[in-house]
Design a protein with these regions (language model features):
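Aromatic-rich, lipid-facing transmembrane alpha helices and their immediate juxtamembrane interface loops
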Residues: 1-227
Length: 227
């Protein structure tokens, strides 16, 4: 079984997901998405006194912006992680601004939805990001490489090899399926204004299970750009 295979590989000194590779990044995506969603939810509860769902997906408490941010941050800044703190901060500052800007453009172009708008804040860039949050991205990069990623990486490497690989495939399949369903719900939601009557079984299912009021509860901070 899987446990026997794990024992055999561990006896041979094989470590799961050593270094930076696909398996480790999948686990980083999963853990960061989950923790990011929890952190955002707590932050909004404390600052806005509101219990707001912050998940990017239809299913589960996963913030894809945090997850992808952690993965891309790890890949993009892996060369500077051993440099001084200022270099890491500056790299994270610019990386975060570009990443947040592109995420905003992507959701608007492909889904017709706006999940955040910083137009009311000073030093914003097209309302998609601003200097304050870019500063936070710099801090996040510094904290990530100095305090979070090293112990997280070691923890992931302690997962039994076969178990870790099997779970990585399951996580990947779940995120892909969840992403497809979420995308279909978003596209149907923005297209419902021009085409209120479902044209096929899939659209009918989405209309039945995810009408506008349900979508509003899923993403209460979202703006429908077509409205």
């Amino acid at each position: 079984g899987i446990s026997d295979a794990d024992k055999l590989l561990e006896e041979q000194g094989i470590i799961f997901a050593r270094g930076i590779n696909a398996a480790k990044l999948i686990w980083v995506l999963f853990i960061s998405s989950l923790i990011g969603d929890i952190v955002e939810t707590i932050y909004v509860l404390i600052v806005g006194h509101e219990l707001m769902r912050r998940s990017s997906f239809v299913l589960g408490p996963f913030s894809l912006v945090w997850g992808l941010g952690a993965v891309i941050l790890t890949l993009a800044l892996s060369k500077v992680k051993r440099q001084n703190n200022l270099s890491i901060f500056i790299s994270g500052f610019f990386f975060g601004g570009v990443f947040e800007y592109l995420c905003s453009v992507f959701t608007e172009v492909f889904f017709g939805m706006k999940f955040w708008d910083y137009s009311y804040m000073p030093f914003n860039i097209d309302g998609r990001t601003n200097l304050l949050f870019m500063f936070f991205w710099g801090i996040v990069a510094l904290v990530w490489f100095r305090f979070i990623y090293p112990p997280l990486s070691k923890t992931i490497e302690k997962i039994p090899p076969v178990t870790g690989t099997v779970l990585a495939f399951i996580i990947t399949a779940f995120f892909i399926c969840n992403g497809i369903v979420t995308s279909m719900v978003m596209i149907r939601t923005t297209g419902r204004k021009e085409q209120p009557v479902a044209r096929n079984v899939i659209e009918q299912f989405i209309d039945d299970e995810y009408p506008n009021d349900v979508v509003r509860k899923l993403w209460s901070n979202m703006d429908f750009l077509e409205e």
